[in-house]
């Protein structure tokens, strides 16, 4: 009879009977009883009261019974650590048993029991097991070290287990080597210092073990080889030759791991013929992945996507294997389309377009859209194929299938941008399908085409006017594009669009709740009212040509993902530390010993820049405007306030989003962030019946104005709740605020609100729990600013998430939600140090508190001045700067509300678009979060 019988009894008094059976002198009865206990435990019954009785069964030579008892102990030891200690003597005795299976079982079980009391007694048995004569015991003990490190890292380091593990890399048994590699790799990923380093001494040992260990052991060893950088081209070639046979393995994981090693080592090979040889060897196993189950196909395709971006020559002749089959799942088809676009070239474009055209007639709407868009991407990628792509798109438009037509128009808009004034002859065909457009992106694309080529479309004003009639009901994307296109039409044909432009500007600035639309409306308003020719120069300027977007990963990220082939990172196309909790903030290794250069005079000091940073300079109508007050040390003296520009000055408007820009005359001072957002100025009152635009006078900037706040929906996003809450934390004029927008989605009005913060890492709470806002009627919303109190103390573990509750009074109805608190809000306006104080403080902070991390600057070019202005706007102040060829080094300081200083050195490498950030602080626990925010600031993402 099978073991299923143990799951079928549920009678009263069962526990008592089990106790009796566990006390039996017969081993077969004990074994049956323990099986029943395990079965009850498996289905969720509490059998912890039998702990002592089961523990007594450990004293046996029956291996099956011992395994069952160990399983029970592992399950309940965490909840009963005081009882688990009773098993230590038996574990230690079993760890020295003559039977290697029992020795290994004892060590494995002790490693799985995550209780401090047990781990203290594990050290000696583990040390003996690591040096055991039997390889089975050694390989089990190697894995146990990683488990022990997860519970108590210091214990593992102090006991010297890491050194023993490194010695096991030279073990005669390949499985011991593989397990030692796996254990060291896992420890190295979460350790703050390097514990696993491959060098020429152990490289050959790993390669020798590669041929003899199991398939998963091969995966561990292959992955570890990616940590090694070959000394020269010959060594890289030798390693590739040893790894290449693994490409023929039946296990897909082994194949992908071998591909990963080859992809890395080929970068070090100087002989192009050898590289071509290895590329040729990699193609068949990658193609074989596409003949496996759909799930493995998908994983293979995601990895192939990265490989093709890095080395397209590997699969350049394998286009046909990526053609979609009728029975492929949709997720496989989508990935195949991406790779087909990457591999498309002038030689194969004809057959690729025939495939895409065929896909565009299928039933699945999303797949059809992707296929149509793929045709457009091929047109942008391959200049000589653009005309053929246009013809295919026109053929698809003739099918009159609604979603095909709309997607084709979206794609043709991009082709027009890539090839201006080349295919305008098809505009009439596009306009004939105007009435079938119902999707926002398709409408916006058609409106863009009409506005861009308004001078060639006789009835352009009529077409745009038809969209203007339903302006208020349109999507914001359509509204923004319609506004821009009508302004373009007015600049090209003023007589036809004069009334229209007045109407659209009025709708955008006076009757819209969309801040983006209002901002753009005010920009156009002032341009048109100030200088017609200047407006034409800006709005109708020559636009940059769009480029091929097939390779959407920047090179640094791609190189990192190549080293993570066959892992989850290669599927997500994200670095591991972005989604693996243990790795977040732990890639900050490589702490360098700071040279004595800090004691020397800097090579270059920008005195003008230092002076411009002094005092509180008046900010003018821009994003992130703040006055600098209460400066320290040599920065007490204030500069005179800069002269404000005249109202309506076109030169000061940031119009880069409109496709054109005029020279910027603003002084390049960090204290003066002229990133004007058109929120502070308000238009003058006008007579709506006026037929000219003289009423569009520009307003002048006033005092310090808070930037518009980008609120995020944090509760009730689907409007299924009684209220929708959007919000964001801000810092303005030295105060932390919580900006909320409350939307009443219930069936009755709301009059009074109360907010509560639960205990959090930053010690923040609302200054007044009762919100100062009026009643909110059904369907209405209101904005409210909540001053935040901060006790200044940051507690550990640091968690940026704040738990909150909103209460509606007097009904007492509560709504619970969470918000992320940005650490930058804690940085005060008094965080600037003078140079002497900076050097003195740097030396006083222990070297152990120094951190170093390399930040990839994902901007078109490294504009150090612009980056430092952004940092200054967030109260991260530059002290001094040093310049060298292709490098600029800036020293900065900032201070939190709790008076914790953070000292930073940013070394910008202009040639590699990187920034090395070294920092010191007396509170290192906050640095992982601070470095994350610094990365976003440098890359202009916040």
Swiss-Prot record:
Location (main, coarse): Golgi
Keyword annotations: Cytoplasmic vesicle, Golgi apparatus, Membrane, Protein transport, Repeat, Transport
Gene for this chain: ap1b1
The species this protein was found in: Dictyostelium discoideum (Social amoeba)
Cellular component annotations (GO), alphabetically ordered: AP-1 adaptor complex; AP-2 adaptor complex; clathrin coat of coated pit
Residue ranges, compositional bias (Polar residues): 678-693
UniProt region (Disordered), positions on chain: 590-700
Compartments, as annotated in UniProt: Golgi apparatus, trans-Golgi network; Cytoplasmic vesicle, Clathrin-coated vesicle membrane
Oligomer status and interactors: Adaptor protein complex 1 (AP-1) is a heterotetramer composed of two large adaptins (gamma-type subunit and beta-type subunit), a medium adaptin (mu-type subunit) and a small adaptin (sigma-type subunit).
UniProt family annotation: Belongs to the adaptor complexes large subunit family.
SUPFAM superfamilies linked: ARM repeat, Clathrin adaptor appendage domain, Subdomain of clathrin and coatomer appendage domain
Sequence ranges of Acidic residues compositional bias: 596-609
Single Gene Ontology MF annotation: clathrin binding
HEAT repeat intervals: 45-82, 117-154, 156-193, 273-313, 384-421, 458-495
Name this polypeptide is given: AP-1 complex subunit beta
GO biological process terms, semicolon-separated: aggregation involved in sorocarp development; contractile vacuole organization; hypotonic response; intracellular protein transport; mitotic cytokinesis; vesicle-mediated transport
Residue spans of biased composition, Low complexity class: 613-645, 664-677
